């Protein structure tokens, strides 16, 4: 069944453009409340479902928080609001409070004038497809206020940030600390701005913070994991041991070594996996995505670590991890899931697992990076006016086959349609950068030619 509103990560778009409008968000809250009330069979008769609401630091978050609360209460749901907190913090609070669902108001790494609504289940995971479809169906029904005595109540959880800080610290071994480490933290002027610095400071690190002055308009603006240049520069200027950058809602992380060299999600995933494997604590294999660098797959294979690829998106990484009963997976963008530590991807917790590996091994971040030199990877986004069937187009298939022959088994070619934009993504990777660049450009030219025909 097709979806009208929900994408792979909730509802997202430009503020003021449908569906990211106050009236729709209020209706979304009402619809979610009605569905949760009908579906939760564990409620004590006469009690109401409980929903946790958090947000990042976008100025529109206040407006949408009020709209959601109004809709949920009108549907007979009690609400607890946390204020600005990372997306994974809401997953944690939802589980800890035994709530029926959690809702995050965020557009992740997007600019401030975007926003979105995403849901967590009672288990702190993405909502099942059938629940999202039920909410969409309810959205098409008229709003009918519950009887006055059944209207929900709203309260604030004043200590939500402190609870989450302690939860993050609990994922780092008690026998280790971060004393002697100078760390630059880039919080993207986003949801981690007031929780990440205390976590690393209380574990003993000397913390230098940037991107911790949100004003509602500067989230992800030239800072954070999607703009790591500020982090790299700050690490060098402060002669820090390493740097850590999060995205606006705190579920992504990238790091920089003491020379300011960037490590992406693939490299961080390797550090965690290799360290755990050496100590017999990996708990199975590792899940990446179609975009995961081939060097990671090869490096894990040499260490005897199973590796599988999921579709792009942390939702699909989680699905494959659960299917295999594995614990560790992630994306090169910095979404890293450590399911033995948390139910969802968490930038702070992922960074702590990397630091655990550094402390336990005695190696620096630069030392670890040398163990996984990434293969050159060229990605070209080709705008297309009309949809192209990538599987049946003979010209494209011939171009891909020719490129794979030129790589001689030392690389990969990937063609995929963007899920959010009218683009075809052409990715070629291998060990010979000039060859990879040429092959990617040749395939992109064929895509353009076929799109125009």
UniProtKB/Swiss-Prot annotation:
The keyword Phosphoprotein belongs to this UniProt entry's keyword annotation: yes
Binding-site residues for Mg(2+), renumbered to this chain: 108, 247, 249, 251
Single GO term (MF): phosphomannomutase activity
Cellular component aspect of the GO annotation: cytosol
The EC number(s) this enzyme carries: 5.4.2.10
Positions of post-translational Phosphoserine modification: 108
Heme recorded as keyword: no
List of catalytic residues: 108
Protein's name according to its UniProt entry: Phosphoglucosamine mutase
Species the sequence originates in: Methylobacillus flagellatus (strain ATCC 51484 / DSM 6875 / VKM B-1610 / KT)
Lineage per the UniProt record: Bacteria, Pseudomonadati, Pseudomonadota, Betaproteobacteria, Nitrosomonadales
């Amino acid at each position: 069944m097709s979806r009208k509103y929900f994408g792979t990560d909730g509802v997202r778009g430009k503020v003021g453009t449908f569906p990211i409008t106050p009236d729709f968000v209020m209706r979304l809250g009402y619809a979610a409340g009605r569905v949760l009330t009908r579906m939760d069979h564990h409620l004590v008769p006469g009690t109401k479902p409980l929903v946790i609401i958090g947000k990042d630091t976008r100025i529109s978050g206040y407006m949408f928080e009020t709209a959601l609360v109004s809709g949920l209460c009108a549907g007979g749901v009690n609400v607890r609001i946390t204020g600005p907190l990372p997306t994974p913090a809401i997953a944690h609070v939802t589980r800890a409070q035994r709530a029926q669902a959690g809702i995050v108001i965020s557009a992740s790494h997007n600019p401030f004038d975007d926003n979105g609504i995403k849901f967590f289940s009672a288990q702190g995971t993405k909502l099942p497809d059938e629940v999202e479809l039920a909410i969409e169906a309810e959205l098409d029904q008229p709003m009918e206020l519950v009887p006055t005595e059944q209207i929900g109540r709203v309260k604030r959880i004043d200590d939500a940030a402190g609870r989450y800080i302690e939860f993050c610290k609990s994922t780092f071994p008690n026998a280790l600390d971060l004393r002697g480490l100078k760390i630059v933290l880039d919080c993207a002027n986003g949801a981690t701005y007031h929780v990440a610095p205390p976590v690393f400071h209380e574990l003993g690190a000397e913390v230098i913070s940037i991107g911790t002055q949100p004003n509602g308009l500067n989230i992800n603006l030239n800072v954070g994991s999607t703009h790591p240049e500020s982090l790299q520069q700050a690490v060098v200027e402060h002669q820090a041991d390493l740097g850590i950058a999060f995205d606006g809602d705190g579920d992504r992380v990238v790091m920089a070594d003491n020379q300011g060299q960037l490590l992406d999600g693939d490299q961080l995933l390797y550090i965690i996996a290799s360290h755990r494997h050496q100590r017999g604590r990996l708990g199975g294999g590792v899940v990446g995505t179609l975009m995961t660098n081939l060097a990671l797959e090869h490096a894990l294979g040499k260490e005897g670590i199973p590796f599988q690829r999921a579709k792009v998106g942390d939702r699909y990484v989680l699905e494959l991890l659960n299917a295999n009963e594995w614990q560790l997976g992630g994306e090169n963008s910095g979404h890293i899931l450590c399911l033995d530590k948390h139910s969802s991807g968490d930038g702070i917790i992922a960074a702590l697992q990397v630091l655990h590996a550094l402390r336990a091994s005695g190696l620096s971040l630069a030392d670890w990076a040398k163990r996984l030199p990434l293969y050159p990877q060229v990605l070209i986004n080709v705008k297309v006016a009309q949809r192209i069937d990538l599987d049946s187009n003979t010209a494209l298939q011939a171009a891909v086959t020719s490129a794979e022959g030129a790589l001689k088994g030392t690389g990969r070619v990937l063609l995929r349609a963007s899920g959010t934009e009218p683009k075809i993504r052409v990715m070629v990777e291998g060990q010979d950068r000039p060859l990879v660049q040429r092959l990617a450009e040749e395939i992109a030219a064929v895509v353009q030619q076929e799109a125009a025909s």
